[in-house]
Amino acid sequence: MSVVFVAASKLPTPFGEFTMHGFLDEESGKEHVALTMGDIADGAPVLGRLHSECLTGDALFSLRCDCGFQLEGALAAIAEEGRGVLLYLRQEGRGIGLLNKIRAYELQDGGADTVEANLQLGFGADQRDYAMCQPMLAHLGVSSLRLMTNNPRKVKALESYAVTVAERVPLQKGLNKHNRRYLATKAGKLGHMLGSLHQGEAETT
């Protein structure tokens, strides 16, 4: 995979000022972003998150998922610590794209859960790839993370690319009546570590 650094700029946010680093995956043409704060290249494990693009949750305030809540929570946690990195990866809809995500939502409106909808459309349950993270983190001088995630697949993916996950930091945000079944399905079928609140609810909620 050929991922190249393009440019960096300041990014003031309600949480504080970050530096925004732009990267281009030359094979896919996708553009990815890293947001950093503080000195993250000192060798100590860095508080971090891999966040896949979610237009509906991140920008349109959807309550169907927890993505927007997790994005805000991760940025707030980094700002509180004064040091950290968030990789914003262009992998909408767990890798199936925005329009297919809307198609999946339509199937969910008809009774399918989030995994069943993907499978009915001919996709895998989760088609995301995290190979781009290694060159992005290497450019930033980061080799060890305290990773904010509930998804064990992200931990395994980073470790397979020789990035140390020194700690998994749970990031449980935004549970509501609209996403309860979605989160239960992620726990029950995708192995997300969401605690006893969601375990076993996929079939009953």
Swiss-Prot record:
Residues holding Zn(2+): C54, C65, C67
Q: Name one GO biological process term.
A: riboflavin biosynthetic process
Gene3D superfamilies, sorted: GTP cyclohydrolase II
Record's superkingdom?
Bacteria
Query: This chain belongs to which protein, by name?
Result: GTP cyclohydrolase-2
Query: Which EC class does it fall in?
Result: hydrolase
Q: Per the annotation, how and in what number is the cofactor bound?
A: Binds 1 zinc ion per subunit.
The pathway this protein participates in, as annotated, is: Cofactor biosynthesis; riboflavin biosynthesis; 5-amino-6-(D-ribitylamino)uracil from GTP: step 1/4
**Source species of the chain:** Pseudomonas paraeruginosa (strain DSM 24068 / PA7)
InterPro entries annotated for this entry?
A: GTP_cyclohydro_II, RibA, RibA-like_sf
Sequence similarity = Belongs to the GTP cyclohydrolase II family.
